[in-house]
């Protein structure tokens, strides 16, 4: 998605060979118009897949997921990373290991909002080692729902998350695929469009 | 806002005289079309106020704030409740006391995304005791920005948050004002429309 790649080039800050900071339009400040375009793009790629629900994770997945849900006309459920007083019943949970924080944490979705009739599109802001995506996949499967695919705003293709998900048979649609952050520069995977 | 009130009546769960659970469309599952209508309503109420930025707080404020930002054509910044590795520089912080959790926590916004040239609309999902709103007000003022008003999706009018903010001179626009949750029933404040 060219508009996203240009935004990353213009505003992304390469903090290290591993870390790209996009706090000006996705992870802290949000560009609503770009989120709408991202939502339209995900909706277009999954338009014929019979999606009934989008599952994402707080906080940075919410904006792209809601814009996708608006376009597809389906609800969005966001997994919680932190305990909520009113989120208590019928919890589906998964452990997610954070390589950056080096901590294991629980994510949770109420089973009330996912059923075995659902065909789910999982959306997240970043895909790196794939821990959050695997956690969301686990939760969706616990509900007995099926998975149409995984939509990622920014993929760090030099980390193993994508390949592992693809090997497991999941369709991964990433709107910007980063080949490398070396030498302080963002290089994208060259994709051949059919 | 009648569509929101009907949704609360149909899907809200009164957990006690103090707590209303709206996990089916706002706090856990999100109804994107309703969020768009909420965004349109906030945008309409603040259309002539010269808003340059929207400030909200993760996670449930994000969806209504982004829809409002989309309509007004301005960026959204969400305050973080939890430490982020990439959010480090130039932090504006405030302490927020949670009556429900009985804990004090820090919220933070990077000063990079707020300036003394900004005229801010603060948006949040709930207004009860007003602690989160006061925290956001403090952060916006630390940046030297001015505040156009505070947009609230659901106000618990029987708690003191609104009155305190109005006494301090802030304009509070709440789309659904709840008079009482007694006897397991949602009663709205009767408003006279001019």
From Swiss-Prot, chains A, B:
Q: Where does xanthine bind?
A: 20, 27, 156
Q: What EC class does the entry list?
A: transferase
What's this protein's function? Converts the preformed base xanthine, a product of nucleic acid breakdown, to xanthosine 5'-monophosphate (XMP), so that it can be reused for RNA or DNA synthesis.
What are the alphabetically sorted keywords of the record?
Answer: Cytoplasm, Glycosyltransferase, Purine salvage, Transferase
As for pH, the annotation reads:
Optimum pH is 6-9.
Subunit record text = Homodimer.
Quickly give the catalysed reaction: XMP + diphosphate = xanthine + 5-phospho-alpha-D-ribose 1-diphosphate
Q: Which residues bind 5-phospho-alpha-D-ribose 1-diphosphate?
A: 128-132
Q: Which InterPro entries match?
A: PRibTrfase_dom, PRTase-like, Pur/Pyrimidine_PRTase, Xanthine_PRibTrfase
Q: Where in the cell is it found?
A: Cytoplasm
Of the GO CC terms on this record, one is:
cytoplasm
| Recorded GO MF terms | xanthine phosphoribosyltransferase activity
Q: Looking at the record's lineage, which domain of life comes first?
A: Bacteria
**Pathway membership of this protein?**
Purine metabolism; XMP biosynthesis via salvage pathway; XMP from xanthine: step 1/1
Family recorded in the similarity comment: Belongs to the purine/pyrimidine phosphoribosyltransferase family. Xpt subfamily.
Inducing factors: Repressed during growth on purines as a nitrogen source.
Q: What is its EC number?
A: 2.4.2.22
- Pfam families per the UniProt record, alphabetical: Pribosyltran
UniProt protein name:
Xanthine phosphoribosyltransferase
